[in-house]
Design a protein with these regions (language model features):
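DNA replication initiation on ssDNA origins
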Residues: 1-125, 188, 223-259, 269-274, ...
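Short glycine-/aliphatic-rich beta-strand segments at the starts of folded cytosolic domains
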Residues: 121-139
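Histidine-centered divalent-metal-coordination microenvironment in nucleic-acid enzymes
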Residues: 124-129, 164-195, 245-249
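Short, charged/polar micro-motifs that form catalytic or ligand-binding hotspots
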Residues: 134-142, 196-200
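A short, contiguous, amphipathic alpha-helix enriched in charged residues
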Residues: 138-158
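Short, glycine/acidic-rich hinge or "gate" loops at secondary-structure transitions
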Residues: 159-173, 222-227
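C-terminal, helix-dominated tail/subdomain
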Residues: 195-209, 236-240, 247
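Long, charge-rich alpha-helical interaction segments
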Residues: 200-208, 212, 216, 220, ...
Length: 301
C-alpha cells in the first residue's frame, strides 16, 4: 500500500507505539531532489544507560538513500515493527533490515544526511552555515540570518570565486541553517581557502568578514567559527566539508529520549524578516506538516 494514501491519527505513533519511520517515509518524496545521491544518517536517542544516543551512517552501517524510503517502506513493514527485528528478519529484504537499523522503532530519531558525501576530501556541492544561538533569543538569530543572506548576496568578491549559487534557508527546530547551493562543485580546498574560520586571522575568510559586518551593524556578539559561546551568535560553516552531517528538512529536533522541541522546516526567504515567522514555524506538528506538504514543496530546491 502506498504510504501517501495511508492516513493515521498520530504520525509518530501510526500503529499504537512510537515509530518515526512512517513520518519520515511520508516526507521522503519532497526530499528526493535535495538529497539526491546523499547518504542518509540518523541519531537514535536512548532512554536510559550511559550512552544517550548512537549514530547510523553509511561508512559504518551501509549506505541508505532517500529513494530507499520510497521503494522499501510500506504498510506491511510498518505493521511488522511491533515485533523484535530478530523475530521477523526472515520476512524482510536486506534493504528493509537496513532501514530498520537506521530507524529503530520505539525511539525518537533525528534525521541527517552527509552534506557533501561521506568520502573525506570530496568536492563541495553546497555550503551551509549553522546559526548557533547559545543563550540568545531566537528573534535575534532570525535577524542575523536575514543579515547574513544580505551580506553574501552583496559580496561580489565571493561570487567571483564561488560562481552562481542559490540560497536555501532551513529552520532547524531551534535556529537556522543558511545554505549556498553551488551551480558548479568546488574542490575541497575551496572550503579551507575561503570559508573556514580561524581565530588567529578571523578576517581571512568570507565567513569571518560576514560575521564581523553583522557584529558591527546588527548584533554585536556575533562571531564566526565552531566554538560556541554563551550569549553569542556563532556563524558556523564547519559541517560543510565532505564527511560531515547536516540535519534534513522535516527532521524532528529531538531534545531527549522522550521528547522533541521542534521540526526542521524550509523557510520562505521572502518572509525571513516577518514578525510571526518563528511563531508560525513552532506551531507545526508532524501531523500538520503532512497536511501541508504541498505548501512546503515550492520552498525546497
Amino acid at each position: 500500500m502506498v504510504l501517501q494514501t495511508l492516513t493515521v491519527r498520530d504520525p509518530l505513533q501510526p500503529f499504537g507505539f512510537v515509530d518515526v519511520l512512517y513520518y519520515y517515509a511520508r516526507v521522503a518524496p519532497l526530499l528526493r531532489n535535495f538529497l539526491k545521491g546523499k547518504p542518509l544518517a540518523t541519531k537514535i536517542h536512548l532512554p536510559r544507560g550511559n550512552i544517550p544516543f548512537f549514530l547510523r551512517r553509511a561508512h559504518v552501517d551501509g549506505p541508505l538513500k532517500i529513494d530507499d524510503l520510497l521503494t522499501d517502506v510500506d504498510e506491511r513493514l510498518l505493521k511488522l515493527r511491533v515485533n523484535a527485528l530478530a523475530d521477523v528478519r526472515g520476512q524482510l529484504t536486506e534493504k528493509q533490515q537496513r532501514i530498520w537499523s537506521y530507524f529503530v522503532p520505539r525511539k525518537l530519531i533525528d534525521f541527517f544526511y552527509a552534506t557533501n558525501g561521506e568520502k573525506i576530501g570530496g568536492s563541495l556541492e553546497r555550503i551551509y552555515f549553522d546559526i548557533d544561538r547559545k543563550g540568545v533569543d531566537v528573534d535575534i538569530a532570525q535577524e542575523v540570518t536575514a543579515a547574513l543572506l544580505d551580506a553574501i548576496a552583496e559580496d561580489t568578491q565571493f561570487r567571483d570565486v564561488a560562481g552562481s549559487f542559490k540560497f536555501f534557508v532551513l529552520w532547524t527546530g531551534n535556529s537556522f541553517h543558511v545554505y549556498l547551493l553551488l551551480k558548479k562543485p568546488m574542490p575541497a580546498s575551496f572550503y579551507e581557502k575561503f570559508i573556514a574560520y580561524t581565530k588567529d586571522d578571523p578576517l581571512r575568510s568570507f565567513t569571518g568578514r560576514w560575521a564581523a559586518a553583522i557584529a558591527k551593524n546588527v548584533y554585536q556578539k556575533t562571531q564566526g567559527g565552531h566554538e560556541k559561546k554563551q550569549g553569542w551568535i556563532t556563524i558556523d560553516p564547519s559541517q560543510s566539508p565532505s564527511g560531515k552531517l547536516a540535519r534534513c528538512p522535516f527532521s524532528l529536533h529531538v531534545s531527549d529520549a522522550d521528547s522533541y522541541d521542534g521540526i526542521a522546516l524550509p523557510v520562505d526567504i521572502m518572509k525571513l524578516r516577518g514578525t510571526t515567522l518563528i511563531k508560525d514555524l513552532k506551531n507545526y506538528t508532524p501531523k500538520t506538516v503532512l497536511d501541508h506538504l504541498d505548501s512546503f514543496k515550492r520552498l525546497l530546491p
